[in-house]
Amino acid sequence: MEYQLTLNWPDFLERHWQKRPVVLKRGFNNFIDPISPDELAGLAMESEVDSRLVSHQDGKWQVSHGPFESYDHLGETNWSLLVQAVNHWHEPTAALMRPFRELPDWRIDDLMISFSVPGGGVGPHLDQYDVFIIQGTGRRRWRVGEKLQMKQHCPHPDLLQVDPFEAIIDEELEPGDILYIPPGFPHEGYALENAMNYSVGFRAPNTRELISGFADYVLQRELGGNYYSDPDVPPRAHPADVLPQEMDKLREMMLELINQPEHFKQWFGEFISQSRHELDIAPPEPPYQPDEIYDALKQGEVLVRLGGLRVLRIGDDVYANGEKIDSPHRPALDALASNIALTAENFGDALEDPSFLAMLSALVNSGYWFFEG
């Protein structure tokens, strides 16, 4: 299924992206759920899938994490089942992500899907990332507050909430409606009837993640082996003093690594092309030979990217799942980065090069791309 998003992107980016929340009524016309509640519940029984149940009764909140064996103990009100990265495990839901590729691929994270019974929700809370919440089957009431300094608390060790807030948006969403919320705006949603919601979340690494990730890269490649030296050690009034110029020199030693463009690009390509959630990688058995890949494409078969696989381009380099893809065939690499589905036409003359076919075969045999059907 192909989903068509009714949205004036230039206007949205200017007025709302990372600025103000907004309800997009009938963002998807005639919306059809790509997954059923039963299918979602089945996914939450799998150990590889990240899921949780959130419920509340008389002001007391409970959170449990999957995989779940049964749902028989749940009542008819006040609970929600939330499943992360469903687009990694259920191919039809991945189609919901594609209309949002007007925004950079490296900023898009995953598709979280929730099923809620009446009264179900996770309470008032803040997110530090952008999210588009699509209303599927059923109705849900959403409240969004102003972006202010808010006190957070934990009614349960696995649940972070904020205090009650005054709403600037208070709307009942129906199938196909979309609520966009930028980072830092408090919000809460409660199902009015059995309801499905689809949250397209965005990735925003913080400084701590960046420094930690770059440090791992430096250690793995044994970079930064230069030692501090001071042949002209300056005098000081007290031997315990560390002088400002020494602090500057130490800072410069660290910045020198980050300021190497090729290393910084290589690190960030590997870092940001890795998914935060497990992928449904299933290498083909037996593995494909390069000539089999060639024949299949020439016969019109379509090569499809694995759901959730992050394929990104930085300059002339393309990265997939933390690996740099090397090939002199730039148009073919661009096709891998730009297209979800690929045909022989996308690869052009590159298919006649045995080295490119060997590289493509390795990607397919890693489970990153597969033949449709």
Predicted segments — roles?
Residues 1-16, 28-177, 185-228, 232:
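Active-site region of the double-stranded beta-helix
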Residues 220-292:
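C-terminal amphipathic alpha-helical segment
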Residues 12, 19, 324-373:
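Long, charge-rich, low-complexity alpha-helical segments
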Residues 259-337, 361, 373:
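Acidic, low-complexity/disordered tracts enriched in E/D and polar residues
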Residues 55-56, 265-270, 347-348:
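Short coil/turn segments at secondary-structure boundaries
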